[in-house]
UniProtKB/Swiss-Prot annotation:
One of the protein's GO biological processes: methanogenesis
Domain of life of the source: Archaea
Quaternary organization: MCR is composed of three subunits: alpha, beta, and gamma. The function of proteins C and D is not known.
Source species taxonomy: Archaea, Methanobacteriati, Methanobacteriota, Stenosarchaea group, Methanomicrobia
Keywords linked to the UniProt accession: Methanogenesis
Entry keyword annotation includes Repressor: no
The keyword Flavoprotein appears for this protein: no
Name of the protein this chain belongs to: Methyl-coenzyme M reductase operon protein D
NCBIfam families attached to this UniProt entry: met_CoM_red_D
């Protein structure tokens, strides 16, 4: 078994860093289009946590109705946003996917953004990965665990193999 988080050692990692925090609607459109690109291995969305309850002051314990805390749909799964979408990190299997994602960003983001290539996602397990996921963790989840999050808050969306098989039958 390989220590790599992906099947290819020469994967490409990119970071999309918009100059503004994305609204839930824009985040849904962008993530939906990224989800459709062939060659995407894994995606991590990063940003400030949106509080669920008031933690201090006179309203301690009251529920917070934040306008950015809305459910979004990616593929067939509905997810409640618990963060402000600030940056998106993507691991890709080829350079063609990189250009497709750049085109998607240019089409959907009406404001400037940085599009960088580098090493953003870990490929070897950290202490947090070991504590949260165990010794036999899925390599695609390595480096993607928030140390403060509970294990039930981790969201993993896998492309449906049935959809890919249907595409092969149609061709």
């Amino acid at each position: 078994m390989s220590d790599s988080a992906s099947n290819t050692e020469d994967s490409i990692q990119i970071e999309i860093f918009p100059s503004r925090i994305l609204s839930p609607e824009t985040a849904q459109k962008l993530m939906g289009e990224i989800y459709k690109v062939d060659g995407v291995i894994r995606v991590m969305v990063q940003g400030n946590r949106l509080p669920d309850r008031v933690s201090a002051g006179p309203g301690t314990g009251e529920k917070v109705e934040h306008p950015l805390r809305k459910p979004i749909q990616i593929g067939d799964q509905v997810i409640e946003l618990k963060i402000c979408v600030g940056r998106i990190r993507v691991e890709l299997s080829n350079a063609e996917a990189k250009e497709q994602i750049r085109e998607v960003c240019e089409k959907l983001l009406p404001f400037p953004f940085e599009f960088r290539e580098g090493h953003f996602l870990r490929k070897k397990p950290t202490v947090t990965d070991y504590a949260k996921l165990g010794p036999e963790a899925d390599p695609r989840l390595l480096g993607m665990v928030d140390p403060k999050a509970k294990t039930d808050q981790l969201i993993f969306i896998e492309k449906q193999k049935e959809q890919e098989e249907d595409k092969d039958k149609d061709e």
